[in-house]
C-alpha cells in the first residue's frame, strides 16, 4: 500500500495516525515525500513538500509505486491519497492505467480543483496567477478549479476501468471547496463510493487538515481496503485545525 500526502505537507504529518493503524491491520505501508524543487517560496520551508506541478508529482508517484511493487513482489497495490495525493493517484491511473492498482481511497482529494473558499477564484480574476505560482508553487495553480491541469485530467471522466474507489469528503473542508467537488462519478468498469464523513457521526467535525487523523475516516479507509470489513465505524470527536 502507498500513502500519498497533500500540498504543503509531508508523509509524517499526513499519516502519523493512519499509517500505524493500517500496519496493525496487516498491511505493508509505504510512503514518501514528493514535489519540491526550490523554485517557489513555500517549498523553501523545511518539511514542506508537494508544491511543484502536479504532472511531475504524478510521475514521481508512478515511479515510487513501481518500486514498491517490485520490492514487494506484488502485481497490484492499494493507494490512499489525501488532498493533492488523491488527485495524483488519478494522474497515475490515467497515464499508466489501472492494471497495477486494486483499491483506491481518497480523503478530501482535489479531483475537480478548488475555489479555496473563493480565494482561487479571486486570484484568477485579478490576474494574480503568476504571483500565486511564485509564492505558493505550481501545485496551487494546478489545483485551481478550471485550471489547464484539472481540465485535461478530467476530460475523459473521473475513473479508469478495473479500480474500486472510496472517496471521503468532509462538510468542514475549507481547502477543497465546495467539499462535494471531491466526489467522483464512476465510469465504465469502475466502482465508486462517495462518503461524507459526518453521515452518521455529527460529532466528527474534521476539516481538511485534520481528517487523516479522524478515527472514523481511518475506519472507512480500512473497510474500503478490506482490512476491517466487519467492525463498526468509530464515531468520536475530531477537531478541525482551522
Please describe what each predicted stretch is.
Residues 41-44, 115-120, 177-181, 206:
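Short aromatic-enriched loop/helix-cap "lid" or pocket-rim segments at secondary-structure transitions
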Residues 8-15, 50-58, 82, 142-146, ...:
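Solvent-exposed, acidic/flexible segments
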Residues 22-24, 71-72, 80-81, 96-100, ...:
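Extracellular/periplasmic catalytic domains that process cell-envelope and extracellular macromolecules
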Residues 160-242:
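C-terminal catalytic-base region of ester-bond hydrolases, centering on the histidine
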Residues 2, 30, 105, 166-168, ...:
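Hydrophobic/aromatic beta-strand patches that form the interior of the parallel beta-sheet core
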Residues 1-38:
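Short, surface-exposed "cap/lid" segments of acyl-processing enzymes
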Residues 36-52:
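Cap/lid segment of the alpha/beta-hydrolase catalytic domain
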Residues 4-5, 29, 47, 55-154:
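Serine-dependent carboxylesterase/thioesterase catalytic core
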Amino acid at each position: 500500500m502507498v500513502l500519498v500526502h497533500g500540498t504543503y505537507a509531508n508523509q509524517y504529518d499526513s499519516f502519523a495516525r493512519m499509517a500505524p493503524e493500517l500496519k496493525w491491520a496487516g498491511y505493508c505501508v509505504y510512503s514518501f515525500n514528493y514535489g519540491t524543487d526550490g523554485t517557489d517560496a513555500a517549498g523553501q520551508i523545511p518539511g514542506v513538500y508537494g508544491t511543484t506541478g502536479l504532472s511531475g508529482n504524478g510521475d514521481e508517484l508512478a515511479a515510487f509505486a513501481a518500486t514498491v511493487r517490485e520490492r514487494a513482489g506484488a502485481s497490484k497495490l492499494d493507494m490512499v491519497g489525501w488532498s493533492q495525493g488523491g488527485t495524483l493517484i488519478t494522474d497515475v491511473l490515467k497515464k499508466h492505467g489501472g492494471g497495477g492498482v486494486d483499491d483506491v481511497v481518497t480523503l478530501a482529494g482535489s479531483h475537480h480543483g478548488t475555489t479555496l473558499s473563493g480565494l482561487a477564484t479571486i486570484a484568477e480574476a485579478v490576474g494574480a496567477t503568476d504571483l500565486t505560482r511564485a509564492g505558493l508553487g505550481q501545485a496551487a495553480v494546478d489545483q485551481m478549479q478550471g485550471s489547464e491541469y484539472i481540465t485535461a485530467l478530467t476530460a475523459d471522466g473521473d475513473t479508469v476501468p478495473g479500480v474500486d474507489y472510496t472517496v471521503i469528503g468532509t462538510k468542514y473542508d475549507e481547502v477543497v471547496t465546495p467539499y462535494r467537488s471531491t466526489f467522483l462519478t464512476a465510469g465504465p468498469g469502475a466502482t465508486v463510493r462517495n462518503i461524507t464523513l459526518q453521515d452518521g457521526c455529527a460529532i466528527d467535525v474534521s476539516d481538511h487538515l485534520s481528517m487523516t487523523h479522524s478515527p472514523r475516516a481511518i475506519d472507512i479507509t480500512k473497510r474500503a481496503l478490506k482490512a476491517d470489513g466487519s467492525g463498526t465505524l468509530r464515531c468520536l470527536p475530531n477537531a478541525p485545525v482551522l
